[in-house]
Amino acid sequence: MREFKLLLFMASALLLFSCEKPVNNDPPLHMPEVTLRTIAGAWQLEEWNGEALADDTYLYIEFDGKSQRFEMWDNLGSMYTQHKTGSFAITKDENDKVIISGQYDNGVGDWNKSYEALFTRRGNSDYMAWITDSESMLFKHIDSIPELN
């Protein structure tokens, strides 16, 4: 009986020490910082304050990092496409957070708010989040702005 207990103990110890945790060889996901270079291109607003936009509602924005200019097309609050242009800036606040702000060309003035901007990833798609204390927007990177009416 003593030999059986010893054999059982050794088998248990062998099983316990021969198992190792799986090794995750994937590199940690590191998203680049939002800069004039990394923001360049076309973006589509997909979520506003955590809610998906209605199917017939859209906002597209295209950034040119070299000139610090943007073009925006939206039908938020209108049944027709509104085209807006302007300039934008990317800065850092006192907590080293990236902040994006902008100004419209048509005399309307500044954007309503300045936003903390950061990149994120969902599946195989790149997203950019704009966040304030009271508002959040999630933009998906797209190849180009679609043809709009």
State each model region's role.
Residues 41-67, 103-111:
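Short, solvent-exposed loop/hinge segments that bridge or flank secondary-structure elements
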Residues 15-18:
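C-terminal motif of bacterial Sec signal peptides marking the signal peptidase cleavage site
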Residues 53-97:
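N-terminal glycine/threonine-rich, aromatic-flanked beta-hairpin/loop signature
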Residues 47, 71-75, 100-106, 128-132:
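Short beta-strand segments that buttress and anchor functional surface loops
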Residues 26-44:
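N-terminal helix-cap/turn-to-beta initiation motif at the start of protein domains
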Residues 1-8:
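Bacterial N-terminal signal peptides that target proteins for export
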Residues 24-28, 81-93, 127-149:
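Edge beta-strand at a domain terminus
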Residues 96-121:
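An anionic, turn-rich surface loop/hairpin at beta-sheet edges
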